[in-house]
Amino acid sequence: MSNPLRYNIGDVRLTYTGRHEAMELSKDKVSTFNLRHQEVLNFYGFELAGGTVFVIDDRVNGHSNLGVFRSKQLRQAVILAAALPAAAVVIDGFGALNKVPKDLQTKDLVNRLKRHNDRIAAQVMSEVLQITTETFDLGEEVIIESAITEGVRAKPGVEAGGNPTIAVGALFGKEEHCSRYSHGLTEEVNRLSMGSDVIDGTGKSVEGLHSSLTALFITESNFKRHLPDIYVERWMTAAPFPEFNPRDTDLKEEARIIADACGIKKFSEMTAYFLDRPRHHPAMDQLNGIGVATPFDKDGDLFPALVMGLDGLRFPDGRGLHSMIGEIGGSAEWTVGALPLVWRGGQSLGMLTSQSSLTRKDLSPEELWNERFHYTEEELILLQDARFEQKPFFTVNDLMENPFAGGVSAFCAISDNYFLPHLEGVKIDHEQGLITTNTLMINCLGNIEHWQLSFKCVEGFETTAKKIRSPKSELRNLEKAQIEKQVKDMVNNETDRFRLKHFFINEYYPAIIHTGSKMVVLEKTIESMIDRKAFSEHDRDIVKAVVRAAPEWFISAA
């Protein structure tokens, strides 16, 4: 029997009739943009051909200023660090599963394709940030440390974990600053923190489905705690609400707290978004029972946080996209979505759950829901190490020293976004050599803008496509001796060397220890990841070839 309060956002579509005020970039502004970002754009053979900035909300929250992000180069670089990876995925990887006959579409193939898309997104995002940080003059210099990331955790029966990503601890900045990051970095260099999900909806990106995107924020705030890459239950909306302990409340009480914050008198006017997972069915049933609608999607729970409560965003029944109440997803998605929501004036509460319990296949939906806080010993140690044992629920204030420090976030649509329909996926005009991207920008002031940028492939589309692919593509299907020769050639080419190093760090971070500006490769960890099929024997050959060809990058193997 159909439930009118539970609907797939792919079938029951949101519309947006709110503010979307266009400001076309003049020729002078386009020229200035190209000059400001010439090193990044030249690296891929791009130039900005034109663009429009659509203002969605220009009100300020009164809690912040831009800080170091008064630099247009820095804040626009965050937009580029979302837009260019999205373009790269569409050039090489989007919808790849659809090119394979159905009878050959195995779980292993899907995971390989997902890793491919994560790899290329992480590659380009890293390169944009590194190239940008190398161009700042004395007095404007920054160093960026990755503090929050997605893709690390194993998903039993689904993914082996260790997906290509921008790992926690990754640094972007001038070499002399990175080498002194933990000892002797001068105060003139601004330290920034970064959170990212290089692709939210990676599965959708390989299937060619809606609402996949790239996502990151960069902030002046330091992080007080590290949030482990495990599942987080979340309660959030676009209005402030008082903190509560989820151990002491039930779903109806939680719904009332959030409804009151939003000024909603009747539950029959309210929505709470969920991922379509068995673990969520009991919560959805309870909320439906009191009149709350529960729209859902098959993948991706980051973007709803960015637009919930937006004026003019409505489902066909007239309800807005209001909240999440008890939804459970990845910790990185929670953080990367929660900070911009707080900048907009909202609130987000999280609580670490037991991933081992929630991924069991032998439990009913009711048992999954009831077991969500039954931690294993290892999970409890993670929770204690992150210092959540006395307060297991948290907000961004518990993670960050100052959430309202200067900061910018950016989210570029890989495919058409069904939560904000104006955010269309990357469009490629092969004949004209034009690539158009659509990026949502939210800054620490609470401003919301939609940046539509069209890039010209100066040397032609095929040349740009080759420049933007992952270095691993050049090593595919090669024998060991061929890999060694190809890697040696890469190391001896300045551009290829730069790209190879970023690939190596993003790909093999689970088996790397950074010390100063050098690395230690953990050979036994490589072998253990091969055993659990996160890496392959091909990866072993690549690692050994890189260590031999670029010994100056490494201290020793362990």
Give the location of each predicted region:
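Glycine-rich phosphate-binding loop plus the immediately following alpha-helix
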Residues: 215, 219-256
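Conserved P-loop NTPase motor module
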Residues: 433-468, 558
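Short helix/loop capping segments that flank catalytic or ligand/cofactor-binding pockets
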Residues: 204-206, 225-227, 282-283, 306
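Hydrophobic "anchor" residues
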Residues: 203-204, 448
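An extended, acidic
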Residues: 7, 17, 251-445
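DPxDG-like acidic metal-binding loop motif
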Residues: 188-198, 204-224
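Short, basic, low-complexity termini and linkers enriched in Ser/Thr/Gly/Pro
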Residues: 473-475
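N-terminal subdomain of lithium-sensitive/metallo-dependent phosphomonoesterases centered on the IMPase/IPPase/PAP
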Residues: 1-194, 328-330, 469, 485-488, ...
